[in-house]
Regions:
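Short coil/loop residues immediately preceding or within conserved phosphate-binding loops
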Residues: 25, 43, 64-65, 87
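Short phosphate-coordinating micro-motif centered on Lys-Gly-acidic
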Residues: 36-41
Length: 124
């Protein structure tokens, strides 16, 4: 399922949202083993997994500890950075070849100022 298709299961996509999707989102192909967000960095991107599988993990005392898996149609972000404005506690890695759409959280915040639909959706 594409990101716009997923959105239409929850909301009606109007012109403002369509413009956001066309100008503020980017789709990337990620190879298995690629880290798209590193622990201890500031990453304010929101990701949607169109295809593949991602995981979040951290290192502690030399051990790699998986905290979550994100299959297709999942939305994820480093909430530490977005909401607490601190470096991420977790890394995000593709554990299969994946197709991922991302956008900056700040751009979604701007859209929320003019789109009640997105403002309400983002609070779910």
């Amino acid at each position: 399922m594409t990101f716009p298709e997923m959105l239409t299961t929850y909301i009606t996509i109007d012109d403002d949202i369509r413009s956001f999707l066309n100008t503020q989102t980017e789709k990337i192909s990620v190879k298995k083993g690629t880290v798209i967000s590193d622990q201890n960095t500031l990453n304010r991107k929101v990701y949607f997994v169109e295809k593949g599988l991602l995981r979040s993990f951290y290192f502690e005392k030399g051990k790699d500890i998986t905290t979550n898996f994100y299959p297709e149609n999942s939305i994820l972000a480093n909430k530490d950075t977005i909401f607490e404005k601190i470096p991420a506690r977790h890394s995000i890695e593709a554990i299969e070849d994946s197709e991922v759409v991302f956008f900056l959280y700040s751009k979604m915040e701007e859209l929320c100022e003019t789109s009640l639909t997105i403002a309400n959706f983002s609070r779910r």
